[in-house]
């Protein structure tokens, strides 16, 4: 839903903020914040436990000097263990006293609210603060949480595969490397990034950051030769070799009655999976309100699983990772698809098709479709 709003009504400032948060410079600044600035939120005071007094200077020395290379939670744990040792409590009460000491130490933090701490960082970067945590901020919030409290669960596995890697930021990958210490494989297509433009330079920088090897998969198996070549013409470059599987030519219609044309195509393909792939939910609702046929179509939703339905509608975003026998892309107008991110959206939508692909425009066709002729 957030991406749907961004695609339909995102401002230039929205996209600039995303570009900043998906940059390696942002990651370096954030790592510096995690390793230095965030630690300064700890303001120790002299602690008294019965007859035992632990001076502020001693706590400060342990935290800021002796353990300065550790994350906050490990410093707090070490100081709490030190207090338990000094107090010489019976073993049966060690855990309770240790937890009490930890709680008192965390109370010496100016704040442990991860969003509030993240906003401190954003202010220092002269970026807008957040009120709600979005996909563009969740990795940073979790990294702050990990620094403060550690992870309370072992998430490791024998092998991890992460798909759609183009949708993740350098901060996400930094988080992944902290969570999983096993071998990992990241898969994706930089041309299917729908909220930012990526390049091979980005991949090289990412590989260097996470110490990974890049392997290019240069053969397309999903679509027919006709669809694959057409999709690559939308991009204006060749990105893969095609498997020798022929099919129908991609079809384009310019008509004022978009609904009627969709219904006609659907009627001719009742035994195949058909998906009407729209730019936004607004378009889906517009079509369903105008057609009793389309009103019966299942709408793909990221929050629910797909059924066995053969007739579907989806936004381009929710169609990612899914394939259909027949794809229909309505409102393929220039006013609807005109910038570089729109180009990527059209590419993503067209690559959902296995056998047949249809574009329908009711105004001047998109410039990216005109270039394919």
What positions do the PLM features span?
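Conserved helicase motor core of SF1/SF2 NTP-dependent helicases
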Residues: 126, 146-159, 166-348, 352-373
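Alpha-helical nucleic-acid-binding subdomain
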Residues: 1-160, 166-175, 191
């Amino acid at each position: 839903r957030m991406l749907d709003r961004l695609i339909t009504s995102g401002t230039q400032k929205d996209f600039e903020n995303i570009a900043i948060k998906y940059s390696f410079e942002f990651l370096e600044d954030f790592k510096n914040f995690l390793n230095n600035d965030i630690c300064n939120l700890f303001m120790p005071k002299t602690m008294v436990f019965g007859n035992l007094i632990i001076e502020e200077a001693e706590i400060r020395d342990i935290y800021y000097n002796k353990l300065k290379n550790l994350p906050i939670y490990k410093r707090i744990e070490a100081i709490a263990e030190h207090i338990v040792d000094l107090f010489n409590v019976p073993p049966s009460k060690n855990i309770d006293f240790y937890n009490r000491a930890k709680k008192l130490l965390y109370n010496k933090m100016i704040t442990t609210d991860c969003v509030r701490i993240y906003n401190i960082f954003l202010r220092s970067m002269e970026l807008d603060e957040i009120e709600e945590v979005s996909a563009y901020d969740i990795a940073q919030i979790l990294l702050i949480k990990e620094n403060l409290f550690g992870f309370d669960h072992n998430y490791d596995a024998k092998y991890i595969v992460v798909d759609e890697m183009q949708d993740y930021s350098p901060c996400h990958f930094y988080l992944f490397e902290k969570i999983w210490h096993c071998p990992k494989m990241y898969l994706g297509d930089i041309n299917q990034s729908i909220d930012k433009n990526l390049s091979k330079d980005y991949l090289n920088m990412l590989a260097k950051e996470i110490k990974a090897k890049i392997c290019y998969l240069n053969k397309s198996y999903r679509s027919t030769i006709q669809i694959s070549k057409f999709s690559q013409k939308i991009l204006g470059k060749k990105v893969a070799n095609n498997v020798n599987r022929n099919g129908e030519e991609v079809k384009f219609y310019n008509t004022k009655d978009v609904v009627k044309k969709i219904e006609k195509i659907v009627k001719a393909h009742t035994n195949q999976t058909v998906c009407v792939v729209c730019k936004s939910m607004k378009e889906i609702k517009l079509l369903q309100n105008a057609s009793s046929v389309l009103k019966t179509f299942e709408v793909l939703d990221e929050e629910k699983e797909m059924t066995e339905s053969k007739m579907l509608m989806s936004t381009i975003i929710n169609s990612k990772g899914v394939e259909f026998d027949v794809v229909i892309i309505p409102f393929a107008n220039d006013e609807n698809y005109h910038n570089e991110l729109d180009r990527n959206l059209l590419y993503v939508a067209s690559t959902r098709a296995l056998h047949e692909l249809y574009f329908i425009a009711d105004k001047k066709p998109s410039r990216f479709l005109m270039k394919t002729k």
